[in-house]
């Protein structure tokens, strides 16, 4: 029967196989916390690193000094500087300004001129108009329009729908012809276009006020002499009439004469029946008329000698 031989490891071999490796390597220099002046360093790795110097400073070496004029126990207070001569303290938010409203208005007028009052020679918003007011109450706005009160009456001669053909289609708008006058010798014809009838009439009224002319008339409210004029294909003939005759004319010619204040006159359309051209032809015929006094002054003779 065979026997089995077993070997028992010795203590030396176990120590060699199972050697304990320390977690942190041992330092080559002992750590000392004594109050020596020699610097110490602490190394936690096997690699060489620069030492960290630790110095011990005695508390008695620190000297705390104070200025002779300062007292640490005294409370510190701040004295503001003195106010210069002529210093005016700022006013509070709720206090009124030092100047009155009249002084402020005069200073504003000296710098920027007179403020816009909203009124012009021919009414408000005709020649001068603020941009914000024009945007709020301009043409096409939904706000209520204020009628211009300047002594002129308005008469709509014609309102038609016009079409502009473009590449993308047709643009349809309304064209209005308006005659304005004060029936005292002032009359004007204007044209306006807009997407709405009301806006077109308002534009035409403003345009007519910008083209006001003076009509020469005698004391019998008629023309001083006969005259003819044409505008485009329209031709208009005007003749003076005796008192009590009235205005014998038709279409746009009659409207222009009535708004000008003519009460006795004869008018006739000889060419085209276009309302705008006939109205403008009437304006041209009236503009070329002259008073007797103007003719006598140009000739250098008294007015009584004109009929000799």
From Swiss-Prot:
Residues 152-215 form the S5 DRBM domain. Residues 1-55 form a transit peptide. It is found in: Plastid, Chloroplast. Keywords: Antibiotic resistance, Chloroplast, Plastid, Ribonucleoprotein, Ribosomal protein, RNA-binding, rRNA-binding, Transit peptide. The keyword Ion transport does not apply. GO terms for molecular function: mRNA binding; rRNA binding; structural constituent of ribosome. SUPFAM superfamilies: dsRNA-binding domain-like, Ribosomal protein S5 domain 2-like. The keyword Glycosyltransferase does not apply. InterPro entries: Ribosomal_Su5_D2-typ_SF, Ribosomal_uS5, Ribosomal_uS5_bac-type, Ribosomal_uS5_C, Ribosomal_uS5_N, Ribosomal_uS5_N_CS, Ribsml_uS5_D2-typ_fold_subgr. It comes from the Eukaryota. PANTHER family: RIBOSOMAL S SUBUNIT, SMALL RIBOSOMAL SUBUNIT PROTEIN US5M. Component of the chloroplast small ribosomal subunit (SSU). Mature 70S chloroplast ribosomes of higher plants consist of a small (30S) and a large (50S) subunit. The 30S small subunit contains 1 molecule of ribosomal RNA (16S rRNA) and 24 different proteins. The 50S large subunit contains 3 rRNA molecules (23S, 5S and 4.5S rRNA) and 33 different proteins. uS5c binds directly to 16S ribosomal RNA. This is Small ribosomal subunit protein uS5c. It comes from Spinacia oleracea.
């Amino acid at each position: 029967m065979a026997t089995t031989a077993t070997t028992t490891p010795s203590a030396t071999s176990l120590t060699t196989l199972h050697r304990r490796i320390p977690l942190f390597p041992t330092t080559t220099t002992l750590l000392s916390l004594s109050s020596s002046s020699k610097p110490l360093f602490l190394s936690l790795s096997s690699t060489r690193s620069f030492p960290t110097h630790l110095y011990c400073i005695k508390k008695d070496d620190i000297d705390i000094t104070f200025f002779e004029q300062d007292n640490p126990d005294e409370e510190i207070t701040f004295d503001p500087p003195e106010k210069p001569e002529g210093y005016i303290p700022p006013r509070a938010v709720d206090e009124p300004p030092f100047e009155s409203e009249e002084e402020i208005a005069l200073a504003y007028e000296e710098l920027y001129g007179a403020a816009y009052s909203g009124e012009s020679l021919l009414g408000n918003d005709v020649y001068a108009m603020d941009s914000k007011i024009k945007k709020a109450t301009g043409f096409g706005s939904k706000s209520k329009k204020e009628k211009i009160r300047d002594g002129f009456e308005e008469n709509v001669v014609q309102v038609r729908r016009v079409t502009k053909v473009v590449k993308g289609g047709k643009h349809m708008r309304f064209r209005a012809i308006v005659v304005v006058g004060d029936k005292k010798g002032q009359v004007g014809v204007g044209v306006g276009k807009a997407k709405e009838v009301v806006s077109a009439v308002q534009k035409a009224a403003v345009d007519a006020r910008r083209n006001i002319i003076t009509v020469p008339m005698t004391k019998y409210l008629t023309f001083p002499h006969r005259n003819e004029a044409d505008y485009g294909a329209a031709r208009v003939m005007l003749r003076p009439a005796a008192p009590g005759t009235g205005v014998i004319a038709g279409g746009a010619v009659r409207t222009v004469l009535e708004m000008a204040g003519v009460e006795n006159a004869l008018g006739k359309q000889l060419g085209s029946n276009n309302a705008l051209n006939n109205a403008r032809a009437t304006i041209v015929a009236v503009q070329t008329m002259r008073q007797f006094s103007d003719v006598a002054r140009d000739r250098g003779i008294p007015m009584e000698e004109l009929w000799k």
